[in-house]
Amino acid sequence: MAKPAGDAAVGSRSGELFLPSVSSSATSPAPSAAPAPASVSLLSLNGEAPLIRGLSLVSQAPGEALAWAPRTSCPGENTSSGGKVSPYSLEISEKLFCSACDQIFQNHQEQREHYKLDWHRFNLKQRLKNKPLLSASDFEQQSSTGDLSSISGSDDTDSSSEEDLLPLDEGRAESEKPNRPPGFYPHRVLFKNAQGQFLYAYRCVLGPHQIPPEKAELLLQNLQNGGPRYYVVLMAAAGHFAGAIFQGREVVAHKTFHRYTVRAKRGTAQGLQDAHGRASRSAGANLRRYNEAMLYKDVRNLLAGPIWSKALGEAETVLFRAPRSGRSLFFGGQGAPLQRDDPRLWDIPLTTRRPTFGELQRVLHKLTTLQVYDEDPREMVRFHSPETHWKPVREERKKDTEKEKTKVPSDANKPLGQDEEPLKQGSESQEEDGSEVELELVELTLGTLDLREFEVLPKRRRRRKKKERSQEQQCGAHGPLPQQPQDEPFSQPTQEVETPLDTLVYEAKAPGQPELWDTLLAACRAGEVEVLKLQLATGLVDPGVKSLLNAPLGSGGFTLLHAAAAAGRGLVVRLLLEAGADPTVQDSRARPPYTVAADKSTRNEFRRFMEKNLDAYDYNKARVPGPLTQEMEARQATRKKEQKAARRQREQQQRKQREQEEQEQEEQRRFAALSDREKRALAAERRLAAQLGAPSPPVPDSAVASAGRCWSCGVSLQGLIPFHYLDFSFCSTRCLRDHRSQAGRPSS
C-alpha cells in the first residue's frame, strides 16, 4: 500500500533519512528529458537539402499566450499580488530559468550556452552593482558597435569598459522585458522548415548588418545559400594575435604573433598601466612597451599585405574579438585595416580563450553549426527539481540495512535524533498492518558543477618566516603578549617555533616569590632605577633578592638581565651587573643577555663592565666582543664629530653649486631671449667702452651683461673654443646651423 503524498518516509540506505522535497503522488511519472538538438554544419548545406526547404523566419512563438499562462513563480517574475519577487529570493524554481536575464530554457545544454554569453555575464555584473539590466535587443544593439571586450574573458580587460555599456533607454529596456518571448537568444535567429523542424543559426554568419527592421528575405536567402563563403577571423588579447582567412572549411592563410606585453600576476597590458598614470621605469616595463610597439607594427604590416588586404576587401563576414585597450591594432590611425562602421564586422558572440589558430577554427566551427529541433525550442519545458520515485524493497534487505546503520558513527546520526521518534512510530503502525512491502524514497540530485567555466582551488598559504623574525627584532618596543593556556587541546608542533622575547619574559614567574619577582621584573622593563636600587639594597639582608638575579625562571629561561637588555634599559643593565648578575647565563635557546639587547647603547654597558671587571666572568661565553674604554669612546665621539662636520660642509658646497647652476641657467635663458639687434647693440657698446678705456655702459639686466655667450642658446663660452661666422660666436656647429637657417642663410 503506497503512502500518501504528504507523508515522510524512512530510507533504507546507509541509515540516512530522506524526505520528499515536493509533494507528489507516488504513481506520478517523472518528467521526460527533452531531446538533445541535432547539429548540422552550415557550410555543408546546398540549395537542394531537404532541411532548408520551405524555410520561414520565426518571430514569435505560436503558443506565446500559453507560454505566459499562470505558472509556478520564478525569481524575478510578477506575483499574483502585483509585487515583484526579489531576484535574491530563496525559492527553488521548477524550471530552467535565469533570473538575471529573465530567460526560460528547454534543456541543460541551452542553459549552459546562455551562461557563457556576454549578455548574461554583463547582466550579472550590472545586478551586483545595483544598476539596471540590459534587455536582449539593447545588448545586441550595443554589442554591434564592438564594446564587449571587457566581458569576453580576455586576460587584458579593463573595468572601465563595463561602465560604457549602459542601456540606451533604461525605461524602455525595463518595459520590454515582460513582452520578450520565452527562449529568446541574442545573436541567434530561429527558422522553421517545411517539415516542421526548427533551426537555430547565429546571426553573424547570415550576412552583414541591416538597418532595423531586418529583412527576412535576405536572412533566408543567406541561409539557403550556405552562408558566406569567405570569412576573416581576427582575435587579439594580452600580447597574442591570431588571424585566419577561410574559404568554406578550407584555410587560405593564417598567422599568429606573440609578444611579452603583460606582466605576470598583474593581468593588464603595459600601455593600459601607463594610461592610468602609473608609468614604471623598470627594464621589464620598457621591454613591454617595446613589444607593444612591435606587435602593433607586425599586425599592421600583415593586414596591409596583398593577401590580407584583398581578403579583408572581399570577405563577406569579418569576425572580430579584441579587448578595449587592444583595439588600436585594427582601428584608428593611418591605414587602419578595419573601420568601425563596416556592416560586415561582427563581434564574436562566444566566450573565447587565448588567441591561437586552433581557437579560430573552433570559433568558426561553433558559429557555422545549426541546431535542429523537432519541436519549438521555446515551448519545451523541463522541471529543474530532484527526480523522486517510490521503489519497493523486500524484507530481506532490512537486516542488511540495520547492519549498515551500525557501521555509521554515532556523531553522524546526532542531528537526526530528534526526528527519528515520530518516524519510527509511523513505520511501526505500517508493520502492524501486515504489509510485506516497504517503500523507499530515492532522491536523484542534478549537479551543476559542469556549468563552471574554471576550477576554483583554495589558495595555498605561504610560510611567513620573515614576519616572525621582524616580530622578534621588535619585541623590545611592544608590550607583553598574552600567554596561551597550558591545557589547550591543540597538539604541540614537532618543529621548534620561534617565540617573541616579550612572551618569554612574561612567562618567567618565580614559584616561591611571585610578588617579589613581579616587582623586580616591572622595574627592569620600565627602567625604574630607584625602585631597583631599593630592592637590591634590601638584598643584603634578604637572600631571596640575590637568588633571583641569576635564576632562569619560566619556560623561556629568561633572567632579569635578559629582560632589561631586551627592553633597552642601559642603566638597569649596569645596576644589575654591579649587583652581581651573571652575563653568561643563557636562556632556553642558548642566548646570553648581550645577544638579546635592543640597541647599541645597551650592548655598550656590557663592554664597559667588561673593561672594569676583566676577569670576573667568561666573556667569550657571554659573547661580549671586547672591552670599551674611555679612550675608545673619545675616539668614536671625535670620529662622529668629524664625520658630521664633513657632511655639513659637503651639504653647503652642494647647495652653493646648485645655486650657481640655477643662476647660470637663468642668465642663459635671459640672454637667449634677447633679439639679435639687442645682442649686437650690447656687444658694440662693450667694444666701444673697451677701446675708450671707459667703464662699460649700463645694461638692462646684470643677468645678461656678459656677451661672452653662445649667440643661439646662451651657453657661456668660458673655457670653450667658440665657432664664429661674421660677428657671431657659437658653442657648437649645431647652434651655428640653427642660427643660419633662422637668418635665411642655409649652411653649405
Curated annotation (Swiss-Prot):
Q: Which residues carry this modification: Phosphothreonine?
A: 629
Primary localization: cytoplasm
Q: Where is the composition biased (Acidic residues)?
A: 155-167, 429-438
Coiled-coil features, chain-numbered ranges? 628-681
Q: Name one GO biological process term.
A: protein quality control for misfolded or incompletely synthesized proteins
Which residues act catalytically here?
270
Instruction: Summarize subunit and interaction data from the UniProt record for this chain.
Output: Interacts (via VIM motif) with VCP.
The name under which this protein is listed is tRNA endonuclease ANKZF1
Native species: Mus musculus (Mouse)
- Name the encoding gene, please: Ankzf1
